[in-house]
Amino acid sequence: MRAYTAGTRWVWLDLDDTLIDFRANSLESLRLTYADCHLDRYFSSYGRWIKSYLHHNHDLWERYNRAEITQDYLRMHRFLDPIREHVPDMSEEEFAPEARSMDTIYLDHLARQKCMIDGAMELVRHLRAHAYNIGILSNGFTDVQHRKIHTVGLDTLIDLIGLSDDIGI
């Protein structure tokens, strides 16, 4: 590795898709959620469900990042909207408890996944070995991000975690 700028004390890294392979972990968690929640009741295949889920989830995150919706709305509707798209006669009130349960199941699976970006752990260990303070930044949900950091073993290597939830953005 190249020498670092003299006087640099902190290195800040994004968590998802820089250190942790969010996409791989999320897809595995969604596959497990599909099976655990028996979503084949509503969809003819996992492929149809995941396509609908990813479309709605992307739109909801865009709206959340613009502060147009709340975290609670995002977490429920990313599961509710794909199902209502395929089962239009189902009311929000009828499915809301199941959608909330699905979100909990998904986030629990997500927090347990261990797939990291190639070379990420080596980078963090290298920085730690050279006495750099390491901070992690993320826009993920506080409880899940802390669990993910612990699951992959980063919690013993970092000094500070800055989460958008914690600072109100």
State what each model feature region is.
Residues 22, 26, 71, 75, ...:
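Hydrophobic (often cysteine-bearing) scaffold residues that line and stabilize catalytic clefts
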Residues 31-35, 80, 84, 125-128, ...:
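Class I S-adenosyl-L-methionine
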Residues 108, 112-115, 121, 135, ...:
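Substrate-recognition "cap/lid" segment bordering the active-site pocket of phosphatases
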Residues 7, 12, 72-73, 92-100, ...:
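Short, acidic loop-to-helix structural element flanking the phosphoryl-transfer center
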Residues 36, 55-105:
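A metal-dependent, Asp-based hydrolase signature
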Residues 2-55:
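Active-site neighborhood of HAD-like aspartate-dependent phosphohydrolases
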